[in-house]
């Protein structure tokens, strides 16, 4: 407990949108990140406003960021220093409920007030306590398991521009992994649509997974302070399950870009000089503070899946570029693949994984994956020639390769559980062994006699046989 932990009162002296300057008595200035409370009474409105100390301005003044709209707040209002930072409830009781960034329960107001609370500002685990993981997390999605295998206890990101399927794929992973995981899941909705949060709540309840999932939301209608802190609030809940209960935890974050965007808004409001492309000068530091806490320690882990919006499909933008350095696997969603009607719209040549290595996944898996990548890369290299001269001008070997590449592209598509209500087709799950076997046969030419359409939006070999038969061909 610090010297400023005793509750002291100050006064609001300046309000600029979500930025509030507060003056405290000499010697009682609150520390950075302390939470302050201000009581607002305006007409029929009565509420407690939470402010977080962001800067010390000198002369007993602090600059704070409000976590709620400042409507009704006026100069002279008394502000109380709580002596601690923002904290959220932790423990088994948070499962099955929705919280905001401040730890207030949204589906059952007042719930969780008497729970143990942890500060959202925490240090990452010590380096000596970290435990590298190389175990593969099987998803049942062919394109992911074959070409960008996910690491259990690792950090995984889904990159993509607007409208290419990031949120759908995140929901698909929740359906596939959380159902079979058996552990605890935490979902952070950072600056995304409220409708999507409601849809997720309903889907989790229908799938009987809600009882093992905690949800924390700070959606796009919230002030930037809330959107900047909600990921830390969700992560704190996940850390409790990892550190105190020794559980393997799944952490879903949608969307990391909104976390960066909120930080940029706050930085501008605080008057900091902008850095590249207008982002905050502290971008790398803020991203590191979040990502370094998402890690595996001895015998327990947090496996995170993060959606990352790519502004204007520009992967050199500082927001997605800063995220890359922290990841174990990247799945890049492509507008070009999306335009072909191939879902999930994963770009197999741009996606990567640190465990696509024969020492981890085995020689057979690695060999088949590399052959698939080789064929797709050669097909990409031939695109310009095909566009100018036509496919008939290619050598026979290249013609055959192009036909196989087109079959591979379509076979990488798959019906998803999260899209069942829209497509009317049940989602399919393909075991890794079957995926490797099927693509091995495909790259060797065993399926050259089948029409391309037979490979489109199906699961494994059984689905391929049925689809081929319906098109008048035999496997």
Curated annotation (Swiss-Prot):
One of its GO terms (molecular function) is ATP hydrolysis activity. It is a peripheral membrane protein. PROSITE patterns: ATPASE_ALPHA_BETA (PS00152). GO terms for cellular component: plasma membrane; proton-transporting ATP synthase complex. Keywords: ATP synthesis, ATP-binding, Cell membrane, CF(1), Hydrogen ion transport, Ion transport, Membrane, Nucleotide-binding, Translocase, Transport. It is found in: Cell membrane. It comes from the Bacteria. ATP binds at residues 160-167. Its main location: membrane. It catalyses: ATP + H2O + 4 H(+)(in) = ADP + phosphate + 5 H(+)(out). Its EC number is 7.1.2.2. F-type ATPases have 2 components, CF(1) - the catalytic core - and CF(0) - the membrane proton channel. CF(1) has five subunits: alpha(3), beta(3), gamma(1), delta(1), epsilon(1). CF(0) has three main subunits: a(1), b(2) and c(9-12). The alpha and beta chains form an alternating ring which encloses part of the gamma chain. CF(1) is attached to CF(0) by a central stalk formed by the gamma and epsilon chains, while a peripheral stalk is formed by the delta and b chains. Belongs to the ATPase alpha/beta chains family. Produces ATP from ADP in the presence of a proton gradient across the membrane. The catalytic sites are hosted primarily by the beta subunits. This is ATP synthase subunit beta. The gene is atpD.
């Amino acid at each position: 407990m610090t010297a400023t932990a005793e509750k002291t009162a100050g006064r609001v002296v300046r309000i600029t949108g979500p930025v509030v300057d507060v003056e405290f008595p000499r010697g009682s200035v609150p520390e950075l990140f302390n939470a302050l409370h201000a009581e607002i009474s305006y007409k029929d409105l009565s509420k407690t406003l939470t402010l977080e100390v962001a800067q010390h301005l000198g002369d007993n003044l602090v600059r704070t960021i409000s976590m709620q709209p400042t409507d009704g707040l006026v100069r002279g209002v008394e502000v109380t220093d709580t002596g601690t930072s923002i904290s959220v409830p932790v423990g088994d009781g948070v499962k099955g409920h929705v919280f905001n960034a401040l730890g207030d329960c949204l589906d059952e107001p007042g719930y969780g007030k008497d729970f143990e609370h942890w500060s959202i500002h925490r240090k990452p685990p010590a380096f000596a306590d970290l435990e590298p993981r190389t175990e593969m997390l099987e998803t049942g999605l062919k394109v992911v398991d074959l070409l960008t295998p996910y690491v259990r206890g690792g950090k995984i990101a889904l990159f993509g521009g607007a409208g290419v399927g990031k949120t759908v794929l995140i929901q698909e992973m929740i359906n596939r992994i959380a159902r079979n995981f058996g552990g605890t899941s935490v979902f952070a909705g950072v600056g995304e649509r409220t409708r999507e949060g409601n849809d997720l709540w309903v889907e989790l309840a229908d799938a009987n997974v809600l009882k093992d999932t905690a949800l924390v939301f700070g959606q796009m209608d919230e002030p930037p302070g809330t959107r900047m802190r909600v990921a830390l609030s969700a992560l704190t809940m996940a850390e409790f399950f990892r550190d105190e209960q020794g559980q393997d935890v799944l952490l879903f974050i949608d969307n990391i870009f909104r976390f960066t965007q909120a930080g940029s808004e706050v930085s501008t409001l605080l008057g900091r000089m902008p850095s590249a492309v207008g982002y905050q000068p502290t971008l790398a530091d803020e991203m590191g503070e979040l990502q370094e806490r998402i890690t595996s320690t001895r015998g327990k882990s947090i496996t995170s899946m993060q959606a990352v919006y790519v502004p204007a499909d520009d992967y050199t933008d500082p927001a997605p570029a800063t995220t890359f350095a922290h990841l174990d696997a990247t799945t890049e969603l492509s507008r070009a693949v999306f335009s072909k009607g191939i879902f999930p719209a994963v770009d197999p040549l741009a996606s990567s994984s640190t465990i696509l290595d024969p020492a981890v996944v085995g020689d057979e898996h690695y060999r088949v994956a590399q052959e698939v990548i080789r064929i797709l890369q050669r097909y990409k290299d031939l695109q310009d020639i095909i566009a100018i001269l036509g496919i008939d001008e290619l050598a026979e070997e290249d013609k055959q390769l192009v036909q196989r590449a087109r079959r591979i592209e379509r076979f990488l598509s798959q019906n998803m559980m999260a899209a069942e209500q829209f497509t009317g087709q049940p989602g399919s799950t393909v075991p890794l062994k079957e995926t490797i076997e099927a693509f091995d046969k495909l790259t060797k030419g065993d399926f050259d006699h089948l029409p391309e359409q037979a490979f489109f939006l199906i699961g494994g070999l059984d689905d391929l046989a049925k689809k081929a038969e319906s098109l008048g061909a035999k496997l």
